[in-house]
């Protein structure tokens, strides 16, 4: 036996749009406590773009930018939800031309070294990256099955990442996938890493 819904018991039951308790105790301004129905003027109950049961004004920021390549979320005025995250186009210069936007981030080697080895780390000298032409150990561009594919001379900065840890550690690297240069990283002027190749930014995006 299924009990009929009881308006005012603070349980959302079949046939009710809301249930905020008795009229004396109800703290939900969107809900008519006497009928357990939403007021006729209600547009929304909750959400980043809902305030006092109404959609907030179009253009109101509902999500802050997370990076120079990320776009702030703005309410549409027609929905309670913040729209899906949007980014600046891939390939747009960022961080004062040290990088290019890639999927909402600005990947640069200096930041990757910082994340791997801490505040004293920066990008190693170009000569270190020549190791990636060897195709042995940790130094390669790609793997095919168990075979290591060495980097072509023009692609060495899209293989293993090399960092310098001040004051005196040169050509430091990290093993595994974490130690590879991130996709979308600037490898030369107007070029980015894509599929472990250093390619023209305007061509790939």
Curated annotation (Swiss-Prot):
InterPro entries: ADAM_Cys-rich, Disintegrin_CS, Disintegrin_dom, Disintegrin_dom_sf. This is Disintegrin-like leberagin-C. GO terms for molecular function: toxin activity. Signal peptide: none annotated. Glycans are attached at residue 120. GO terms for cellular component: extracellular region. Disulfide bonds join 7-26, 18-36, 62-82, 69-94, 101-106, 113-128, 151-158, 163-171, 193-198. PROSITE patterns: DISINTEGRIN_1 (PS00427), DISINTEGRIN_2 (PS50214). Monomer. Keywords: Cell adhesion impairing toxin, Disulfide bond, Glycoprotein, Hemostasis impairing toxin, Platelet aggregation inhibiting toxin, Secreted, Toxin. Belongs to the venom metalloproteinase (M12B) family. P-III subfamily. P-IIIb sub-subfamily. The lineage of its organism: Eukaryota, Metazoa, Chordata, Craniata, Vertebrata. Negative results: does not interact with the alpha-2/beta-1 (ITGA2/ITGB1) integrin. Does not inhibit platelet aggregation induced by collagen or ADP. The disintegrin domain belongs to the long disintegrin subfamily. Residues 4-90 form the Disintegrin domain. Pfam families: ADAM_CR, Disintegrin. Inhibits platelet aggregation induced by thrombin and arachidonic acid with IC(50) of 40 and 50 nM respectively (in rabbit platetelet-rich plasma). It also inhibits the adhesion of melanoma tumor cells on fibrinogen and fibronectin, by interfering with the function of alpha-V/beta-3 (ITGAV/ITGB3) and, to a lesser extent, with alpha-V/beta-6 (ITGAV/ITGB6) and alpha-5/beta-1 (ITGA5/ITGB1) integrins. The keyword Disulfide bond applies. Expressed by the venom gland. A motif (D/ECD-tripeptide) lies at residues 68-70. It is found in: Secreted. SMART domains: ACR, DISIN. The keyword Glycoprotein applies. Its main location: secreted.
């Amino acid at each position: 036996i299924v009990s009929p819904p009881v308006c005012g018991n603070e349980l959302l039951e079949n046939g009710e749009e809301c249930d905020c308790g008795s009229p004396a105790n109800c703290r939900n301004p969107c809900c008519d406590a006497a009928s357990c129905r939403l007021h006729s003027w209600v547009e929304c109950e909750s959400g980043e773009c809902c305030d006092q049961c109404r959609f907030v004004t179009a253009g109101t920021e509902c999500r802050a930018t997370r990076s120079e390549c990320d776009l702030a979320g703005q309410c549409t005025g027609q929905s309670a939800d913040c729209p899906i995250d949007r980014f600046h186009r891939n390939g747009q210069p960022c961080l004062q031309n040290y990088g290019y936007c890639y999927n909402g981030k600005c990947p640069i080697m200096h930041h990757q070294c910082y994340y791997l080895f801490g505040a004293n780390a920066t990008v190693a000298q170009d000569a270190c990256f020549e190791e990636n032409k060897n195709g042995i150990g940790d130094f390669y561009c790609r793997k095919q099955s168990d075979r290591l594919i060495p980097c072509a001379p023009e692609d060495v900065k899209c293989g293993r990442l090399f960092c310098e840890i001040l004051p005196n550690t040169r050509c430091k690297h990290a093993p595994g996938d974490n130690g590879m240069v991130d996709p979308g990283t600037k490898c030369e002027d107007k070029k980015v890493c894509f599929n472990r190749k250093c390619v023209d930014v305007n061509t790939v995006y």
